[in-house]
Design a protein with these regions (language model features):
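An amphipathic alpha-helix/helix-turn recognition signal
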Residues: 51, 85, 114-115, 127, ...
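Gly/Ala-rich beta-loop-alpha elbow adjacent to hydrolase catalytic centers
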Residues: 90, 108-116, 120, 128
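A short acidic, glycine/proline-enriched capping/turn motif at secondary-structure boundaries
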Residues: 93, 117-118, 141-142
Length: 204
C-alpha cells in the first residue's frame, strides 16, 4: 500500500478545531446511494475534495475517480466498486464542507448507515483514509464474490411490525437485516424468498 498521507488526519483535525455543537450529528450513507457523476462538482471546485479522490486512486491502484465520474453505471454498481466509491465521495463531501466553511461546528456524533460506519470512523480520526479505502474495497470484493456464489437481495418493508412482520419472514429463508425506523425494516435472503416476502407484505 502507498505510504499514508496526512489527509485523513488533516480532515479530523480541522473538524476538532471547530467549536463542538452538542446538537449536531453527521450520518454518512451506505450502499445504494451512489450514481455516476456524484462528487464531480466537488472534485472540480475544492482541492481538498480532489485530494480525497486522488488518494483513493493511489491506494486502489486503479482509476476509481474515472469510474465514479464517467461510469459505466453497471460497473460502478458492482459491490466491489460501489463501496469504495461511496466512501470516497462521502469523504470528499466532508472535505468540501470543511474547505468552504459550510461545516463550522464539530459534530457531537458521527455515524454511518452500514458501509457509512467506515466513513464515520475516518471523519472521527479513528481510521485513516488509506486503511478505510483498502478495507472497504476488500469488503466489497468479498461481498461481490459471495453474492455471485449464492445470489441474494434485500427489500425494505414499510408499515409492518409485530406479528404481521413475523408472518412475512418467519420460516421463509428471509432474515431481518436492518431496523431503519420503527415503521421500516430491511429483509434479505435468496432472491425468490425475498420476492415472496415482499409480495406477502404488500397484501397486508
Amino acid at each position: 500500500m502507498p505510504q499514508a498521507s496526512a489527509l485523513s488526519t488533516h480532515l479530523a483535525e480541522r473538524l476538532r478545531a471547530t467549536p463542538r455543537d452538542a446538537s449536531l450529528a453527521i450520518l454518512f450513507p451506505g450502499q445504494g446511494s451512489h450514481q455516476v457523476g456524484a462528487g464531480r462538482d466537488l472534485f472540480d471546485a475544492f482541492p481538498l475534495a480532489r485530494e480525497v479522490f486522488e488518494r483513493a486512486d493511489q491506494v486502489l491502484r486503479f482509476p476509481l475517480t474515472k469510474l465514479c465520474f464517467e461510469g459505466p453505471d453497471e460497473e460502478l454498481r458492482d459491490t466491489a466498486n460501489a463501496q469504495p466509491a461511496i466512501l470516497t465521495a462521502s469523504l470528499a463531501c466532508l472535505a468540501a464542507a470543511l474547505e468552504n466553511g459550510a461545516l463550522r461546528r464539530q459534530p457531537a456524533f458521527m455515524a454511518g448507515h452500514s458501509l457509512g460506519e467506515f466513513t464515520a470512523l475516518v471523519a472521527a480520526g479513528a481510521l485513516s483514509l488509506e486503511d478505510a479505502v483498502s478495507l472497504v474495497a476488500t469488503r466489497g470484493r468479498l461481498m461481490q464474490e459471495a453474492s455471485e456464489r449464492q445470489p441474494g437481495t434485500m427489500a425494505a418493508i414499510i408499515g409492518l411490525n409485530g406479528e404481521a412482520l413475523d408472518e412475512v419472514y418467519r420460516g421463509s429463508g428471509v432474515e431481518l437485516c436492518n431496523y431503519n425506523s420503527p415503521s421500516q425494516v430491511v429483509v434479505g435472503g435468496p432472491v425468490a424468498a425475498v420476492e415472496e416476502a415482499s409480495r406477502l407484505a404488500k397484501e397486508r
